[in-house]
């Protein structure tokens, strides 16, 4: 009798977790599905149709630089002023796991609230890759 109840509880828990997610059914935000935030070794590793570049961060970072506002970034990412003086489209996140779908453990991005969004988005966090 305990096994069916346990299975039912697990099924309900997974349905609840899926219902709380703001990601689309096939997983990830539009920006993640486009390749934003992925690790890379060179420009050829990033999807060319979006003009993503392999940015110079540890492990590389498929992204866009020189954005001026969130409107310059794919949905699910935001324009962030980085400490190096450049603006980048970084993924928006809730937790660190949101940042590292396509990154190796030795080059994980951090989900940080200590960033400056060009559009002044307070209360949000962004995936900041390691320098």
Regions found by a protein language model. Name each.
Residues 22-131:
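Secreted, cysteine-rich disulfide-bonded mini-domains of extracellular proteins
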Residues 1-18:
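Sec-dependent bacterial lipoprotein signal peptides
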């Amino acid at each position: 009798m305990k096994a069916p109840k346990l299975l039912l509880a697990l099924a309900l828990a997974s349905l609840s977790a899926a219902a709380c997610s703001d990601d689309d059914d096939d997983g990830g935000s539009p920006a993640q599905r486009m390749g934003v935030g992925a690790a890379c070794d060179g420009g050829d590793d990033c999807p060319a149709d979006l003009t993503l570049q392999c940015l110079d961060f540890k492990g590389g970072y498929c992204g866009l630089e020189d954005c001026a506002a969130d409107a310059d970034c794919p949905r699910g990412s935001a324009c962030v002023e980085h400490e190096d003086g450049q603006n980048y489209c970084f993924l928006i996140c809730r937790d660190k796991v949101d940042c590292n779908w396509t990154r190796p453990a030795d080059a994980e991005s951090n989900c940080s609230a200590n960033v400056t969004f060009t559009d002044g988005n307070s209360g949000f966090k962004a995936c900041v890759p390691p320098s």
